[in-house]
Swiss-Prot record:
Native source organism of the sequence: Klebsiella pneumoniae subsp. pneumoniae (strain ATCC 700721 / MGH 78578)
Role: Catalyzes amidations at positions B, D, E, and G on adenosylcobyrinic A,C-diamide. NH(2) groups are provided by glutamine, and one molecule of ATP is hydrogenolyzed for each amidation.
Family matches, as InterPro entries: Class_I_gatase-like, CobQ/CobB/MinD/ParA_Nub-bd_dom, CobQ_GATase1, CobQ_N, CobQ_synth, GATase_3, P-loop_NTPase
Molecular function GO terms recorded: ABC-type vitamin B12 transporter activity; catalytic activity
Taxonomic lineage: Bacteria, Pseudomonadati, Pseudomonadota, Gammaproteobacteria, Enterobacterales
PROSITE patterns linked to this entry: GATASE_COBBQ
Name used for this protein in its record: Cobyric acid synthase
Keywords: Cobalamin biosynthesis, Glutamine amidotransferase
Entry's family note: Belongs to the CobB/CobQ family. CobQ subfamily.
Length: 507
């Protein structure tokens, strides 16, 4: 029978996703066929499986840690917020509908059978499953319809390990309060606690650990230190918390506009990993003053974020950067915003709205959502400073609802290779300093990223760097470093014992 364990947290952003990835890596290293699973994920960072299904980025990088290809069954429900009260509901990788929070809460019980069937199908193929909860299991107002925390643990009949974040303070209160709010049968599933993100001497915690174990009867399985491991973040919490607000100087300064509905900011992880690059996420228009490249990222609410650009003064700051000859790149929603016109007769019903007018393009929103992995080739119309990128092969994925057409004389940035045909994508401005594309994951292609950065270095009078960072190997090293640290600081043997002791047939 399949071994299974579920990590739940005392709150959001306590580090569940990273620790799940670490366990997946450890079990993979130990020779077990392992897969991650999260029944419901709310995030704007998503990716595409090899068969064109959309799922959360967290489960994609967890699958990578487990040494397997991502499978939409690992994240059957994805909620993508489009506003403070509305979210797009993606079921098994395809858009199903949009709902407000109250309607979705009423709808959730209908999903239980599908979730269980998907989980059972994974359990039939893998030797170990590592489940992840969402937020906290102690949200007592949501308990009756829970499908992602204790409700999922009950369906899977698996033990739970509670993760608590000491960096935010009040860790023992968070552990005690969470366990106190659980029902007796729920609390009985919690077989251990991991204290995460500790800075300092663990000896200072010993008396507290002894007391919390005595108070709750639940053992603390380990104390994970704060790790400088570069792994993907699930949502915008990391941006708000300042993880990417670097202050050290690098040769190349890249400013990513932090849109209110920013999506797929994982696009820029490979950029941030480069030795000569500082990536900043900015909302202050003045923060564009020193940028060597400005990026408008993806958005889950293109027109809403376009309005914010104008109201915040960021659109004016982008135009000032253009006047200073600073290169500008738009990806997906950012690409749409850079065009002349956006026509929306689907979502908002606003009709034709003016874009920023940087690229000679017109975007029509559509009901159909394009979700596909693609290979592409950089076009030949690149400016001199980017000439080394011409003809390079890149890979990535598309996630967008809409079609963008170039006006006559506006060259494409890329040629996508789809079903044996070459399809133009993206656009280049007349001055060769502004670009747009629908392709996410572009910077994961090492040769292109180094060509772009060396072009920016050339514009600053800096010598090029010869070697390109091999981002795939870089990520593998991060997974291995995480696994090594978890083996050192967490009683992995006890986790194995918990999983084996509570191995039960699925209901």
């Amino acid at each position: 029978m399949t071994l299974a364990v579920m990590l739940q947290g005392t709150a959001s952003d306590v580090g569940k996703s990273v620790l799940v990835a670490g366990l997946c890596r450890i079990f993979h290293q130990d020779g077990l066929r392992t897969a991650p699973f999260k029944s419901q994920n709310m995030a704007l960072n998503s990716g595409i499986t090899p068969d064109g299904k959309e799922m959360g980025r967290a489960q994609i990088f967890q699958a990578e840690a487990a040494g397997i290809a991502p499978d939409v069954r690992m994240n059957p429900i994805l909620l993508k917020p489009t506003s403070d009260r509305q979210a797009q509901v993606v079921l098994m990788g395809q858009v199903a509908t949009s709902m407000d929070a109250v309607s979705y809460h009423q709808y959730k019980p209908r999903l239980r059978e599908q979730i269980l069937a998907v989980y059972q199908s994974l359990a039939g193929e893998y030797e170990a499953l590592v489940l992840e909860g969402a937020g906290s299991p102690a949200e007592i107002n949501l308990r009756d319809r829970d499908i992602v925390n204790m409700g999922m643990a009950e369906m899977a009949q698996c033990p739970v390990i509670l993760v608590a974040d000491i960096d935010r303070g009040g860790v023992f209160a968070a552990i005690y309060g969470t366990l106190a709010l659980l029902q007796p049968q729920e609390r009985a599933r919690v077989k251990g606690v991991i204290i995460n993100k500790f800075r300092g001497d663990v000896a200072l915690l010993r008396s507290g650990i002894e007391q919390i174990e005595a108070l709750t009867g639940v053992p603390v399985l380990g104390v994970m230190p704060w790790l400088d491991v570069d792994l993907e973040d699930e949502d915008g919490v990391a941006l708000q918390a300042g993880k990417y607000h670097r202050t050290d100087r690098r040769d190349i300064d890249i400013a990513v506009v932090h849109l209110p509905h920013i999506a797929n900011f994982t696009d820029f992880n490979a950029l941030a990993a480069q030795p000569d690059v500082r990536v900043r996420y900015v909302r202050d228009p003045q923060a564009l003053a020193d940028a060597d490249l400005v990026i408008l990222p993806g958005s889950k609410n293109t027109l809403g974020d376009l309005c914010w650009l104008r109201e915040s003064g960021m659109a004016h700051a982008v135009e000032q950067a253009r006047q200073r000859k600073v290169p500008l790149l738009g990806i997906c929603g950012g690409y749409q915003m850079l065009g002349e016109t956006i026509i929306d007769e689907v979502e908002s019903g606003l009709g034709a709205q003016p874009g920023l007018g940087v690229l000679k393009t017109v975007t029509h929103f559509a009901q159909h959502k394009t979700t596909t992995q693609v290979q592409a080739t950089l076009g030949s119309a690149l400016p001199d400073w980017l000439a080394d990128a011409a003809g390079l092969r890149v890979s990535g994925y598309e996630i967008h609802m809409g079609e963008t057409r170039r006006e006559a004389g506006c060259p494409p940035l890329l040629q996508l290779h789809k079903a044996g045909q070459a399809v133009d994508d993206g656009a280049i401005s007349d001055d060769g300093l502004a670009f747009g594309t629908y392709l996410h994951g572009l910077f994961d292609s090492d040769a292109f990223t180094r060509a772009l950065l060396n072009g920016l270095r050339q514009r600053k009078g800096l010598a090029p760097l010869d070697s390109a960072l091999e981002y795939a190997r870089y990520k593998t090293r991060q997974f291995d470093r995480l696994a090594e640290a978890m083996r050192e600081h967490i009683a992995i043997d006890k986790i194995y014992a918990i999983m084996r002791q509570h191995q039960e047939p699925l209901c």
